Design a protein with these regions (language model features):
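Catalytic-site signature of metal-activated, phosphate-bearing donor transferases
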Residues: 10, 84, 88-91, 97-98, ...
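Short acidic donor-binding/metal-coordinating loop in glycosyltransferase active sites
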Residues: 58, 78, 96, 103-106, ...
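Conserved donor nucleotide-binding strand/loop of the catalytic core
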Residues: 65-93
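Cell-envelope/extracellular polymer assembly enzymes that use nucleotide-activated donors
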Residues: 26-28, 52
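A conserved acidic beta->alpha catalytic loop
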Residues: 38, 46, 57-67, 103
């Protein structure tokens, strides 16, 4: 299935407050989590307007499951299957067809909440993307790769599903994708060292996925991919306006491109040597 863009944009008038709630499609918020107790409370609070909250926990040892249950979420234990399959499991476990998929370190802003309620009162599409704002090195990014990081998170599961990708998963749909206003706030609160460790793991997983799919890399991709990425996000998308945090964020993304293809080339050489 392919994902197609649509120019439809919803921006509700926040100054107009109805005297009673509008009838709308019921929806579930689904969250995957593991050892996320320090972040999950804020996520659950921001999602409290949902008709149901489902938290799929993968063996937390820090009280994540207990915290979620204590705040009214339905908690399901499931061994880790990779990001895409874990999120799809959560979607299928929901009671309602309309779902909003969140990570434990994300929060729904008030403008986004208003947009979600508005579109669910009269859905004009089956899938909606929203701008995701990332906090990095203590700064909310406003340009470059960090914003607007359009993310398809609200959808009717009868028309869309998560991919099986173990990392950098995406929602697949054959329907047009509309956009709504209001930021999805992403604040991982992790250290830079922790962030870099995670990126190293992710690029290894990406390289493995590409190799198994029969993809191959050469010197051109190794050199051009990070260079073009830097030009795109630092200059064309004004990443330089985010100061040092913006530069570091984009530079890490460029390094990720280099490392991904370098690891893919290493897998290629290993395969040739073993023949």
């Amino acid at each position: 299935m392919s994902k197609r863009a649509r120019s439809l944009v919803y921006s509700p008038n926040m100054s107009q407050k109805p005297h009673c709630p509008l009838p709308r499609q019921p929806f579930s918020v689904v969250i995957i989590a593991r050892n996320a107790a320090t972040q999950l409370a804020a996520c659950l609070e921001s999602a409290s307007f949902a008709d149901e909250i489902v938290v799929v926990d993968s063996g937390s040892s820090d009280g994540t499951a207990e915290l979620a249950a204590g705040r009214g979420a339905r908690v399901i234990q499931k061994e880790w299957m990779g990001f895409g399959r874990q999120k799809q499991f959560a979607v299928e476990a929901a009671r309602h067809d309309w779902v909003l998929s969140l990570d434990a370190d994300e929060r729904v802003s008030e403008p986004l909440r208003a947009s979600i309620l508005a579109v669910l009162a009269a859905p004009a599409a089956q899938a909606y993307a929203m701008p995701r704002r990332n906090r990095f090195m203590g700064r909310w990014l406003s340009h470059g790769e960090g914003y607007p990081d359009w993310s398809l998170r609200l959808f009717d599961r009868r028309h869309a599903r998560w991919s099986d990708d173990p990392v950098h998963e995406k929602v697949l749909t054959g329907e047009p994708v509309a956009r709504i206003q209001g930021d999805l706030l992403h604040d991982s609160a992790e250290t830079l060292a922790g962030y870099l460790d995670k990126q190293n793991l992710y690029t290894s997983m990406q390289a493995e996925t590409l190799f198994k799919a029969g993809k191959r890399a050469g010197m051109a991709q190794l050199l051009l991919s990070p260079a073009l990425r830097f030009v795109k996000f630092y200059f064309l998308r004004l990443g330089f306006l985010d100061g040092a945090a913006g530069l570091v964020h984009i530079a890490i993304g460029c390094c990720n491109s280099f490392h991904k293809y370098a690891k893919l080339m290493a897998l290629q050489r290993k395969a040739v040597a073993s023949e």
